[in-house]
């Protein structure tokens, strides 16, 4: 009862005091000229539940004093301890010197007795130091973010600091100072618990600190000094003072560290952004808290009479408009302390605002536009494309991958590159936004691989920079990408481009690299030189093959020009489809003829499964092979929909249909439950091929009964002579020193060269290696008989060729003429006018920045050769002086009849008629090769006359192989076998091991590998097909060749001006791929066809010694090098009539 009366008395005293103060304020205001209301002094709320000071006296000084005493008292103790420690150290140092002097004076006899107590003392000190160090290390581990306990503790302290700041925000709505009962105030209890934890954590930090003085002065310690002690004072006095609790906002500076501990912030930009934001916000909130304190309290020297009631958030607003120098004036500081603080804060705040805010905006604006993660769409596959991502490479890839001729490409393309796309590339992505997405990142970063969902991707495609200055470095980068991707997800299918053939060996070192599961390396140098080598064997074949594996839209031309027929063939591509059950049991030629005549499809190969279920690709296997159930066929057609006819064909329903467009899925087909019909088009392509056979290799082989050579061939095998490499795929000879194959200009002139291949190469000792082995290997395939091998003469820098020779010294019939392709004397010495092909290559193309000048050497060499003039009597006189006539001149001899089916000109008097193929880097430079064409500089390469005629080749045409390989992994196997002469993964592993071919003895197994299909050019001028050459139908020729000789025709090499009514002297030819049945033939046409291997073709040369694999070689039936000493006494055996008849009219070339 008394306490209640006492409380009421305090309330009355407070009321009277308030009223008197109010009256005095009002009188003062009335006497003032400016009538401005004055804020009342702060009144401490007093209730009977909370005993407070009876006089209503303010106790803010007690709270502040507790903090100041703690801070300065601790600082004094630390300084005192340091001073005493310093004095002790100085004294001990002086005493130590005295004792040391005494020890020296007393001698060593007393050393043992005097040192013993000192050692005991040192041991005691060491034990004490060890105990203190252990406690210090324990405290350091407890607060260190390197351990789990430390991280939990650091995060917990930060979270509790934010909680204490939130409590401050809540209490800021109350008066600055008020009476509160600790046992009833819930927020005060929580704040007390938080500060007890802060006190314990402060103790751990103090123990772990190396420098106690600096620890005492750091920001976090100051925050604890001015926030922890006042809480304990609040409990003792039953009072609450808002005071300096706003300093807890300074803990926000550590926000970025906490996020790094939690592994949330990983990039430098994100860390910097969070740092700037945390510093800016913590400074802003702390300054607002100080303004809130002084404005609501007033100035002490004014007896707190000039205070104003401002909420904390109004102070936050005031500080923001102050930092931004806007200053609306609606809220402003009235106290002297507040205004003084604003004077200094506006200087620092303005500087911080002017520097931090733009940087924050820049970091936010520079946030990766292409960050994020890929979201997989249900029922839709996606592939990841990385590597060399530029406008050119991406546009070429998308143009082929998303071509309309492909059958419903339901695949999303995800590009991953560490550089954001430029405006042009970004526009390209937007045009294909429904199927293309771009993400910025690196495949070397597992986090970025996870962003693009590499583990669920159908494949990963790696593009290479074909124009880089250092091909080996580019290959190394792509190999590292493969390693990173395979390390992240070993099962992912990878298709990568490689520039150099020797770098493919490094891929075999990757444990998870498995070509049997779909991994493929597209070596651009290997395929480029392989295509050029095929042009040496059958000019124009490289253009036809390049067009077959590229997606081209049909361009219709009404006028009767060579472009009309060329473009009709260009629209054909290679597709695969399972054959209908109606073909089961039929021979391959029968099915091939039926498809061509009735379905308007050209089938060139099948996937054959032997008795042990091993799969092999067989090209034109012959009439002995019967079609099996579920056989996969390889077709040449204009689009994928046409190829489905082979799958839908039903003899009962479609036998009498003449229009192939009406061949669709019939009722019989719907009732069948065939395994192939359950496969999607992509599955059909992916499941076919050698990927299912662990022991099979992608070799083009015929049916098992024909794998063993005839008895005559076995009898003629010389087991003591190594004629072929260990796989039996290539001709081989013992390694030769480069000095033995070097010809001087006079030696070359004395050696009558004809029907050979001249390789003009530009390169020096510093040039990147081209990889000439890839050019020579197709020309030395074992499915050529030895006397059919074309001699190869390299004309170029001997320094460069020495670097390449290590990979060439095992091939026969190779010579080198040191010189330059720009020297006409060197070219005449090698009889370039009598060569079958002149190849112009350059190893210096990528070292020039100006793309227009990258091909300058090749273009100059090509124009130099074309401008040369020859006397047709020179070659005849040179040959006749030794008793020989150059092949192709004497047509009365059977051996010198049409060269491989191609009639050599009676004489070549101008370089324009010399067969040339020039390698180009820049496609637009093709306009400089032919001076008589009218090609526009912006014309695509495949539309230009030099490419259509097979006289130019660029590596860019191989870009389409990336998408072709993805949709059908057998395509790359097929094309590599065609253009490389039969290279296999086993051979690549051997070359990777030894970097050279290894010789092997002739056995039935290795000789069986010679039984591979070959390409021939069939002349229509005379012979068994001469009656069809003059106005006959191509379809009749197709059927006759297939039935009579098992030869599969697939294209025409026609004179450019053959359609003109007036005769033309132009000898240029162009390629027509897969003409229709009714296409009219002309006598000068050359027909591309696939023919069987003829074991008897080499019998007439069986007596030739295969050990003479040098430049001094045997003569060929049609083209060879005629070396004077070695050919004088050669006798030719008579050949069988059938063999001679075939070789008279067929130009046999190997793929």
Curated annotation (Swiss-Prot):
One of its GO terms (cellular component) is postsynaptic membrane. Residues 380-522, 754-898 form the RCK N-terminal domain. Phosphorylated. Phosphorylation by kinases such as PKA and/or PKG. In smooth muscles, phosphorylation affects its activity. One of its GO terms (biological process) is potassium ion transmembrane transport. Mg(2+) binds at residues 412, 435, 437. Residues 586-606 are annotated as: Segment S8. Residues 752-772 are annotated as: Segment S9. It is a multi-pass membrane protein. Keywords: Calcium, Cell membrane, Ion channel, Ion transport, Lipoprotein, Magnesium, Membrane, Metal-binding, Palmitate, Phosphoprotein, Potassium, Potassium channel, Potassium transport, Transmembrane, Transmembrane helix, Transport, Voltage-gated channel. Residues 529-549 are annotated as: Segment S7. Residues 1-36, 674-702, 1101-1151 are annotated as: Disordered. Residues 309-331 dip into the membrane without crossing it. InterPro entries: Ion_trans_dom (IPR005821), K_chnl_BK_asu (IPR003929), K_chnl_Slo-like (IPR047871), NAD(P)-bd_dom_sf (IPR036291), RCK_N (IPR003148), Slowpoke-like_C (IPR048735). The keyword Chloroplast does not apply. A lipid is attached at residues 91-92, 94 (S-palmitoyl cysteine). Residues 81-151, 209-212, 259-273, 362-1151 are cytoplasmic. The modification Phosphoserine is found at residues 680, 693, 697, 893, 897, 1136, 1139. Its main location: membrane. A motif (Selectivity for potassium) lies at residues 325-328. Belongs to the potassium channel family. Calcium-activated (TC 1.A.1.3) subfamily. KCa1.1/KCNMA1 sub-subfamily. The S0 segment is essential for the modulation by the accessory beta subunits KCNMB1, KCNMB2, KCNMB3 and KCNMB4. The S4 segment, which is characterized by a series of positively charged amino acids at every third position, is part of the voltage-sensor. This is Calcium-activated potassium channel subunit alpha-1. It comes from Macaca mulatta (Rhesus macaque). The lineage of its organism: Eukaryota, Metazoa, Chordata, Craniata, Vertebrata. The gene is KCNMA1.
């Amino acid at each position: 009862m008394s306490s209640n009366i006492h409380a009421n008395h305090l309330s009355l005293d407070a009321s009277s005091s308030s009223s008197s103060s109010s009256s005095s304020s009002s009188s003062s205001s009335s006497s003032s000229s400016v009538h401005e209301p004055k804020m009342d002094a702060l009144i401490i709320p007093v209730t009977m539940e909370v005993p407070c000071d009876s006089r209503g006296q303010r106790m803010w000084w007690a709270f502040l004093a507790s903090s100041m005493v703690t801070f300065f008292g601790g600082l004094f103790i630390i300084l005192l301890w340091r001073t005493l420690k310093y004095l002790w150290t100085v004294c001990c140092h002086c005493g130590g010197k005295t004792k040391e002097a005494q020890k020296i004076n007393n001698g060593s006899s007393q050393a043992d007795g005097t040192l013993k107590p000192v050692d005991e003392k040192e041991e005691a000190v060491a034990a004490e130091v060890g105990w203190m160090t252990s406690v210090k290390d324990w405290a350091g581990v407890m607060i260190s973010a390197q351990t789990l306990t430390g991280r939990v503790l650091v995060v917990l302290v930060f979270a509790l600091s934010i909680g204490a700041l939130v409590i401050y925000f809540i209490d800021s709505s109350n008066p600055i100072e008020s009476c509160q009962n600790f046992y009833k105030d819930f927020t005060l209890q929580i704040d007390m618990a938080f500060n007890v934890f802060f006190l314990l954590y402060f103790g751990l930090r103090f123990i772990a600190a190396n420098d106690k003085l600096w620890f005492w002065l750091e920001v976090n310690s100051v925050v604890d000094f001015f926030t922890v002690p006042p809480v304990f004072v609040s409990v003792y006095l039953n009072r609450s003072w808002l005071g300096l609790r706003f300093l807890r906002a300074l803990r926000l500076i550590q926000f970025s560290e906490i996020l790094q501990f939690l592994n949330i912030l990983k990039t430098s930009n994100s860390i910097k952004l969070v740092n700037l934001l945390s510093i800016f916000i913590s400074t802003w909130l702390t300054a607002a808290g100080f303004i809130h304190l002084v404005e609501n309290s007033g100035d002490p020297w004014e007896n707190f009479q000039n205070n104003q009631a401002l909420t904390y958030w109004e102070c936050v607003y005031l500080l923001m408009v102050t930092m931004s120098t806007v200053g609306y004036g609606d809220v402003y500081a009235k106290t002297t302390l507040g205004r003084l603080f604003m004077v200094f804060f506006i200087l620092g705040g303005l500087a911080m605002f002017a520097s931090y805010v733009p940087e924050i905006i820049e970091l936010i604006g520079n946030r990766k536009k292409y960050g994020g993660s890929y979201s997989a769409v249900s029922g839709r596959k996606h592939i990841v494309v990385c590597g060399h991502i530029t406008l050119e490479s991406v546009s070429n890839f998308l143009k082929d991958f998303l071509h309309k001729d492909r059958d419903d490409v339901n695949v999303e393309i995800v590009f991953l590159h560490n550089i954001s796309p430029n405006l042009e590339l970004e526009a390209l992505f937007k045009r294909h936004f429904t199927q293309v997405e771009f993400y910025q990142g690196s495949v070397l970063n597992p986090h970025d691989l996870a962003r693009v969902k590499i583990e669920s991707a159908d494949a990963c495609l790696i593009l290479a920079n074909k124009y880089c200055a250092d091909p080996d470095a580019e290959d190394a980068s792509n190999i590292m990408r493969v390693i990173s991707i395979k390390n992240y997800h070993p099962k992912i299918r990878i298709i990568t481009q490689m520039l150099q053939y020797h770098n493919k060996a490094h891929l075999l070192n990757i444990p998870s690299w498995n070509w049997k599961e779909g991994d493929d390396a597209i070596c651009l140098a290997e395929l480029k030189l392989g295509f050029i080598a095929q042009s040496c064997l059958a000019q124009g074949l490289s253009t036809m093959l390049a067009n077959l594996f590229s997606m081209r839209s049909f361009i219709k031309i009404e006028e009767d020009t060579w472009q009309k027929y060329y473009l009709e063939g260009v629209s054909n591509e290679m597709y695969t489809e399972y054959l209908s059950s109606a073909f089961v049991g039929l021979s391959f030629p029968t099915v091939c003829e039926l498809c061509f005549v009735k379905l308007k499809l050209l089938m060139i190969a099948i996937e054959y499964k032997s008795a042990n279920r091993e799969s092999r690709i067989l090209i034109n296997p012959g009439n002995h092979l019967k079609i099996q159930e579920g056989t996969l066929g390889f077709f040449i057609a204009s689009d994928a929909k046409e190829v489905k006819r082979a799958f839908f064909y039903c003899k009962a329903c479609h036998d009498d249909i003449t229009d192939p467009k009406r061949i669709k899925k019939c009722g019989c087909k719907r009732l069948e439950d065939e395994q192939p019909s359950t496969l999607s088009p992509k599955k059909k392509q992916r499941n076919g091929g050698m990927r299912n056979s662990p022991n099979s290799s992608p070799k083009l082989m015929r049916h098992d009964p024909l794998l063993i050579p005839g008895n005559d061939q076995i009898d003629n095998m010389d087991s003591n002579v190594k004629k072929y490499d260990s796989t039996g795929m290539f001709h081989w000879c013992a390694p030769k020193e480069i000095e033995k194959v070097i010809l001087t200009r006079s030696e070359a002139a004395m050696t009558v060269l004809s029907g050979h291949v001249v390789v003009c190469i530009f390169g020096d000792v510093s040039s990147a290696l081209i990889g000439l082995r890839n050019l020579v290997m197709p020309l030395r395939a074992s499915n050529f008989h030895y006397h059919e091998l074309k001699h190869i003469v390299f004309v170029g820098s001997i320094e460069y060729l020495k670097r390449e020779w290590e990979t060439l010294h095992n091939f026969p019939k190779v010579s080198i003429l040191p010189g330059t392709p720009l020297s006409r004397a060197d070219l005449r010495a090698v009889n370039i006018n009598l060569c079958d092909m002149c190849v112009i290559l350059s190893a210096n193309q990528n070292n020039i920045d100006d793309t227009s000048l990258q091909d300058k050497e090749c273009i100059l060499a090509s124009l130099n050769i074309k401008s040369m003039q020859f006397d047709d009597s020179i070659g005849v006189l040179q040959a006749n002086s030794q008793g020989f006539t150059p092949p192709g001149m004497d047509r009365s001899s059977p051996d010198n009849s049409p060269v491989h089916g191609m009639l050599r000109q009676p004489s070549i008097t101008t370089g324009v008629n010399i067969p040339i193929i020039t390698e180009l880097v820049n496609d637009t430079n093709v306009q400089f090769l032919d001076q008589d064409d009218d090609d526009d500089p912006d014309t695509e390469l495949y539309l230009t006359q030099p490419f259509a005629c097979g006289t130019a080749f660029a590596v860019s045409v191989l870009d389409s192989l990336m998408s072709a390989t993805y949709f059908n992994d057998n395509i790359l196997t097929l094309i590599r076998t065609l253009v490389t002469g039969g290279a296999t993964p086993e051979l690549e592993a051997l070359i990777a091991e030894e970097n050279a071919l290894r010789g092997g003895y002739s056995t039935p197994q290795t000789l069986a590998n010679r039984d591979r299909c070959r390409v021939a050019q069939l002349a229509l001028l005379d012979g068994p097909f001469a009656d069809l050459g003059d106005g006959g139908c191509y379809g009749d020729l197709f059927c006759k060749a297939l039935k009579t000789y098992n030869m599969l025709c697939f294209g025409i090499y026609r004179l450019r001006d053959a359609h003109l009514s007036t005769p033309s002297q132009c000898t240029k030819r162009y390629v027509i791929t897969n003409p229709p049945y009714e296409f009219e033939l002309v006598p000068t046409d050359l027909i591309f066809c696939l023919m069987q291997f003829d074991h008897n073709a080499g019998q007439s040369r069986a007596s030739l010694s295969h050990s003479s694999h040098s430049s001094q070689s045997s003569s060929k039936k049609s083209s060879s090098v005629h070396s004077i000493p070695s050919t004088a006494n050669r006798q030719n055996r008579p050949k069988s009539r059938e063999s001679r008849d075939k070789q008279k009219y067929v130009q046999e070339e190997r793929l």
